[in-house]
A protein has these predicted regions:
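Membrane-interface junction motifs in transport/secretion proteins
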Residues: 26-65
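Mid-to-C-terminal secondary-structure elements
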Residues: 120-129, 149-223, 243-268, 272-279
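A cross-kingdom feature of multi-pass membrane systems that activates on extracytoplasmic/periplasmic
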Residues: 233-294, 319-335, 339
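Beta-strand-rich non-transmembrane domains
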Residues: 108-111, 116, 133-146, 165-181
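Solvent-exposed, non-transmembrane alpha-helical starts
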Residues: 57-67, 108-112, 141-143, 183-197, ...
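Juxtamembrane interface at the cytosolic side of transmembrane helices
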Residues: 301-350
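Hydrophobic secretory-pathway targeting helix
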Residues: 1-38
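Short amphipathic beta-strand/extended segments in non-transmembrane regions
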Residues: 48, 52-55, 64-128, 248-249
Length: 356
């Protein structure tokens, strides 16, 4: 009975650890902004890197082209082309800055949170489209405007408004699309569900006098060796590392990183830099904490199975001579039973060959 209970506890611990691991993977897969490297390629190694800047030393849009040239040079030095033979790309980037805009429709005006975005922002942040399309780095007009459903309902009383127009800072812009307002764990805490518009960076900059600092820069790049992407971006920025925080997004939920989060669990929340993170990064940090807590529970549940396995190994080692003797005896018995049969088989085979 005692052994039966031990077996049940052992199985329950292992199953609990497996379930917690599955829950962690389910939660992580629920934040698409952290999954571009996985979506981009199953066969080749890519690193997704995010960089967030202090307000007083933030990046300016004029610096983006220089950063991109440096990244292309880093790829070429590693014998990797910026574009592959089949038309694929070994890097994509995006940048954004947060502010506020007054957006006016033919019905009313709404003061909303605004992200001025550039590059392939919507590759990194594939919001669910309710109508219309995204805009990207190929948009030469730089007049892209995307509303979330909260803004669309405030301004028009509907989410099906792609193609209609809004006024921002005295200029008229077509609405490219409407996206669903994300909701989920930590949404309220990080103000994820605040009424938001995503506009071309130039529109936001124009509203703030023609120039506006960039809060975040995101990069997906081929990663032939560990930390290649991080190193390439660090060299491209040529800034004091005290003025920004760089995160390898594609590795933030790996086992070793989760252990590091546990190690610095209290300290990591103390932000000593003048950085205001966008809501998606605050949400990801919350998921990091949850993921680390799940790992702690996984390890606790695995303590008993590991202790049981070590105890079994200890017993085997302690009784190794006796076990060896028993094994030899069993092998001897098997041989004694098998030898006569083998001998008869060989004898029969020889007789058959003689008759031939």
């Amino acid at each position: 009975m005692k052994q039966y209970r031990k077996g049940l506890v052992l199985v329950a611990c292992v199953l609990s650890a497996i379930l917690l691991g599955s829950l962690q993977r389910y939660l992580v897969n629920g934040i698409p902004s952290q999954q571009l490297a996985k979506r981009w390629s199953d066969d080749e190694a890519f690193a997704q890197v995010a960089c967030y800047f202090e307000k007083d030393v933030a990046l300016m849009s004029e610096q983006i082209a220089g950063i991109e040239r440096s990244l292309i040079t880093a790829l070429e030095e590693a014998a990797l082309p910026a574009e592959t033979e089949n038309g694929g790309r070994n890097w994509v980037d995006a940048y954004s800055s947060e502010g506020e805009l007054a957006v006016t429709s033919n019905r009313t005006t709404a003061q909303v949170r605004a992200f001025g975005v550039g590059g392939d922002f919507f590759r990194f942040h594939p919001f669910t489209l309710l109508s219309g399309t995204y805009f990207d780095s190929t948009d030469e007009n730089k007049d892209g405007v995307i509303l979330d459903e909260l803004v669309a309902w405030q301004l028009f009383g509907s989410s099906n408004v792609a193609g209609m127009e809004v006024e921002i800072n005295g200029a008229i812009y077509p609405i490219r699309g409407v996206v669903r307002s994300d909701s989920g764990m930590f949404s309220e805490a990080v103000e994820e569900e605040a009424a938001t518009v995503y506009v071309s960076y130039d529109i936001l900059a124009e509203a703030y006098g023609g120039s506006y600092p960039i809060d975040s820069y995101e990069l997906l790049i081929a990663n032939p060796v560990d930390e290649f992407g991080m190193t390439a971006l660090t060299n491209a920025l040529s800034m004091d590392e005290k003025n920004y925080e760089m995160i390898e997004v594609s590795a933030r939920f790996d086992f070793l990183h989760r252990l590091d989060v546990i190690k610095h669990f209290g300290v990591r929340s103390m932000n000593t830099k003048n950085i205001v993170y966008p809501y998606w990064e605050n949400r990801a940090k919350g998921y990091e904490d949850v993921s680390a807590l799940l790992l702690i529970l996984e390890l606790l549940f695995m303590c008993y199975p590991i202790a049981w396995a070590l105890n079994q190994l200890r017993k085997l080692y302690k009784n190794r001579k006796e076990l060896k003797q028993k094994l030899m005896e069993k092998l001897k018995n098997v041989w004694q039973k098998a030898y006569p049969l083998l001998k008869r088989t060989v004898k029969t085979y020889k007789l058959v060959n003689r008759k031939k």
